[in-house]
A protein has these predicted regions:
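Glycine-rich ThDP/TPP pyrophosphate-binding loop and its adjacent helix/strand module
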Residues: 1-188
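Terminal amphipathic helices with adjacent charged low-complexity linkers/tails
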Residues: 182-209
């Protein structure tokens, strides 16, 4: 404990902010002045539905401006930052943490410009409902790509070094997937083997006429 100066961290996607539970939580935290930081990750889409069909003004931080604390009353601090702006993300999260921890004020960070590498499920490819321009924008503003550019621009590493790290990460991911899948299958395979053994025993007894009446 830090003498009660802890921070509760929450995270939610932009589409889920259209649900009633989100608004109930936001209101209650504002009333109680809960020292929390909630991040809203906004890619402007829900499950195949654009923000224009689910969020007033297509902007959750815009419609929550009335919750911003001011000289007239307590409320929230609301910060807006772009997902691909790494330095600004660090500044924003540090600032939000400081406010919540030291002043016991709830904070919302609206992270805009998120990208969606894949659809919301294996059956829902986002190529079906996004324009070619939007898909290209997402490729150009992918957070990993932008972070890599930031690293190269500051001379922290070369592009060749980053490419090597990427290849190593992909290899480790594939190998890890195989290991995890084998572990996951080990018990079912064992149980199946035991069940087959029992069934074969029953079959053999039946062939010997043990179960005949």
């Amino acid at each position: 404990s830090n003498n009660g100066n802890e921070v509760a961290w929450g995270t939610i996607g932009n589409a889920s902010t259209s649900e009633g539970l989100f608004f109930e939580t936001i209101n209650a935290a504002g009333v109680l002045q809960v020292p929390m930081v909630i991040s809203v990750w906004d890619d402007e889409y829900g499950i195949s539905v654009g923000a224009e069909y689910q969020t007033t003004k297509e902007d959750i931080s815009a419609i929550l401006k009335g919750f911003q604390r001011d000289e007239y009353g307590k409320g929230y601090d609301i910060f807006v930052v772009e997902a691909w702006d790494y330095p600004e993300l660090i500044k924003t999260f540090l600032r939000a943490s400081k406010v919540a921890r030291e002043e016991h004020v709830p904070v919302m960070i609206h992270v805009k410009g998120m990208t969606q590498p894949q659809g919301h499920s294996t059956s829902g490819s986002h190529e079906r409902y996004k324009s070619p321009e939007r898909l290209q924008w997402e490729k150009d503003h992918d957070c990993i790509l932008k972070f890599g550019q930031w690293i190269v621009d500051r001379g922290i590493a070369t592009q060749e070094e980053l490419d090597a790290v990427t290849q190593e990460a992909k290899k480790a991911s594939r190998e890890g997937k195989k290991v995890a899948w084998n572990i996951f299958q080990s018990l079912p395979k064992q149980l199946r083997s035991e069940a087959l053994s029992l069934l074969k025993g029953i079959q053999q007894k039946g062939e010997k006429g043990i179960f005949t009446t």
